[in-house]
Regions:
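N-terminal signal-anchor transmembrane helix
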Residues: 32-40, 65-118, 123-140, 159
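Soluble catalytic domains of enzymes that build or remodel membrane lipids, polysaccharides, and related
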Residues: 104-339
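Non-catalytic terminal accessory segments
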Residues: 1-94
């Protein structure tokens, strides 16, 4: 099968741009510089456009083969598809939807309306105004409790006190656990800033509220066999920490952790609900298909014996500001008694 030279050129260009973008967008203090910010945004959208162009080229070439399209028609389809897809994916990346899910829990004495926020990724593409919009949307839902399951920030740019300040306007108690990107930026500083505005940061501990036991885990590996250089505490694993935190049979237990890994240890401990994020649902088709293979729990609600697992697609994006085949979400979880 002969590959068109254009595809080869595009792959080379994308590889070079991806390398440059990875260096420019690395979570280093110098990226706070306004000039660096402009460079990061420019390369991100250039990379995004070329990815969409490559996908559109592939689709239009397949259509050309099937329907024997003339060159002019083929070119028109390519231009139209590239334009529409680029506009849709870049706009969709910032259009946050409320996704409601009903979850049955044992020993629950009353219905609880919970909101889960995950993977907001404050940084070069999202700042204080974006977070304020999320806060307003959450307040409109009138939740009883709010969980933030990591990756609140992704860059030194837009990760200061002022940027996260809108969170103090949330009208329900907030519980936070950190993610891998929080660790890259400086997790202790972020945690202290959150505490100052009234957010309860959970570090391998529990709190009882609303008839629920909430366990919050730091970002960590599921077990010692798993390698992860970004793990906050190298000696800690979900396998080693979960047995040290009491789980009661008389009230529902919810465990917060950034990634859906380690669910077997959460299940073994006797927890009822595991709230996670990290995956973004794959974020961009066809990466969504790869993510479905890489993560047993990629997006939405799953059941593993007694344990239910909810994986949020996140409210932001990782890397480039595109969403295709997934939607940024605010997860509205209606917790109801299973009895």
């Amino acid at each position: 099968l002969k590959i068109k030279p254009l595809y080869i050129y595009l792959f080379y260009i994308l590889a070079i741009l991806l390398s440059l973008y990875s260096m420019l967008s690395a979570p280093m203090p110098f990226t706070v510089n306004p000039f660096m910010h402009i460079l990061v945004v420019f390369f991100a959208y250039l990379l995004s456009f070329l990815l969409i162009f490559l996908l559109s080229l592939l689709v239009s070439d397949v259509l050309k083969l099937i329907f024997r399209l003339k060159r002019k028609t083929h070119l028109s389809i390519l231009i139209s598809l590239t334009t529409l897809l680029f506009l849709y994916t870049t706009i969709n990346a910032f259009c946050i939807r409320e996704k409601e899910t009903q979850i049955q829990l044992p020993h629950l004495t009353k219905e609880i309306k919970a909101v889960q926020l995950s993977d907001i990724h404050l940084g070069h593409f999202r700042g204080e105004n974006h977070l304020r919009k999320i806060v307003n949307k959450v307040n409109e839902l009138n939740p009883d409790i709010i969980f933030i399951t990591g990756d609140l920030v992704e860059s030194h740019y837009n990760s200061d006190k002022q940027t996260i300040a809108p969170l103090k306007n949330l009208k329900a108690p907030i519980y936070f656990v950190d993610g891998n990107h929080d660790a890259q930026v400086g997790v202790e500083k972020l945690k202290n800033n959150l505490r100052e505005i009234g957010v309860r940061v959970l570090e391998n501990e529990f709190v009882d509220t609303l008839g629920l036991r909430i366990i919050g885990l730091e970002y960590m590996r599921p077990n010692k066999q798993t390698s992860d250089p970004l793990s906050v505490a190298e000696r800690k694993t979900i396998q080693s920490i979960m047995p040290t935190i009491p789980v009661l049979d008389t009230m529902p237990t919810i465990v917060l952790h950034h990634t859906p890994l380690g669910s077997e240890y959460v299940s073994k401990a006797g927890a009822d609900l595991y709230l996670c994020g990290h995956t973004h649902g794959g974020q961009i088709f066809p990466l969504t298909l790869i993510n479905d293979k890489n993560f047993v729990y990629n997006r939405g609600l799953y059941k593993k014996g007694r344990l239910q697992i909810y994986v949020s697609q996140g409210s932001g994006t990782f890397g480039i500001p595109l969403r295709l085949g997934t939607n940024p979400e605010i997860s509205l979880l209606i917790l109801q008694s299973s009895l």
